[in-house]
């Protein structure tokens, strides 16, 4: 394969070869008289262009997504140490994640609007550089300024929002059909993988550096690397180029028109509500399950309560490893199962999500039944429950790509993120901590009651997961109609502007 490169002769290309442009379209070969030997700078430029392939772009974007979630959950890996240093309770500790998610979801619609209209890779890189700088600076906050740590997490949420809102749409414009499902599966594998690595990184960096501050000084360095790679190796694909090979969608609708269309898209609305249920559970679990398991071991007399820093990182490490493995299994099983089920029914995507959600709720309920007697049993239930829960991440994104036209996808991803965070993990960590604190204040404080109160608060999660399964079943009812409607609109938008009639 040869790459077009400003008339510079590329090694291995002849005058009869077809030349691939960066957008993936084919152009006639350059004639011999148009070719000349490359100067050193042109050779480097030509080599750089050859590296800008869709697979390389998807790999770099997936790496950046891993870092996004790794940074998000690094704080959770050292949460007990933060509580001891700043002397805050469960509700105040949960506030760290809540303000992060609140700023994340408020910024998401703004970045969605920008992502449908401006250069996406520039926005992505700036977002990564911003949150990396803020995270690094937050590692120097002293114990008198807990409010400043809370503010820093708020700012980090804004930076990470740009990435989550825009990067899936680039992959959507690089691939289509089953190949897009596979690439989105790899991309969304970053959610559990990055979350698990966040716990592990936080624990290891704290132990190596002797203080929890060091947990916040690793991901920024990796973030700067990811931002630079995006600028150099990720090209900006034409919007809709995968859906309409060789061209771009020529008509852009207004933001108001986009929002009206999304509000009328029943598959999009119900799948967004289902995503909110998943976010509610994962947000609460990510913050509180390691704490819950520590308290369970204190009750079983297999561990002592942490009084001084540094606290044991064992449970955060184990939970992080489980999250990584279950994330890998969940995303792979979800992608394979969906491809197989598509041979039986065209509604496979939402139905697989619904079944996995309902199955997950059962095993998550069992965590709180067995934790008092067996930590190993609790870990087994966590493993199965998380695997089933993580099945739907990539499938949900693929549902969106099917039912939303390319020129609205960044806005759709952003508002789906806004909805899932607003109704999900924006409030769940704080709500669980608040319920736990309220139960502890109602009765005499003891180690057994600290364990039970947090468990009772976390029991809210399985019921929310069941509700999410119901929303996926509702999505299945409208999925085919909405998918066909979107395909018809894509064909309309690919025509010359004078012949296009946009459905509002």
From Swiss-Prot:
Catalytic activity: sphing-4-enine 1-phosphate(in) = sphing-4-enine 1-phosphate(out); sphinganine 1-phosphate(in) = sphinganine 1-phosphate(out)
Source species, domain of life: Eukaryota
CDD domains named in the record: MFS_spinster_like
Keyword field: Cell membrane, Endosome, Lipid transport, Membrane, Transmembrane, Transmembrane helix, Transport
The keyword Membrane is annotated on this UniProt entry: yes
PROSITE patterns associated with the record: MFS (PS50850)
Name the record gives this protein: Sphingosine-1-phosphate transporter SPNS2
Gene Ontology terms, MF aspect: sphingolipid transporter activity; transmembrane transporter activity
PANTHER family: SPHINGOSINE-1-PHOSPHATE TRANSPORTER SPNS2, SPINSTER
Places the protein is found: Cell membrane; Endosome membrane
GO CC entries: endosome membrane; membrane; plasma membrane
Family: Belongs to the major facilitator superfamily. Spinster (TC 2.A.1.49) family.
Disruption phenotype: Disrupted formation of the primitive heart tube.
Membrane topology, from the record: Multi-pass membrane protein
Residue ranges of the TM segments: 48-70, 94-114, 122-142, 182-202, 214-234, 269-289, 317-337, 351-371, 375-395, 415-435, 460-480
Keyword set includes Transport: yes
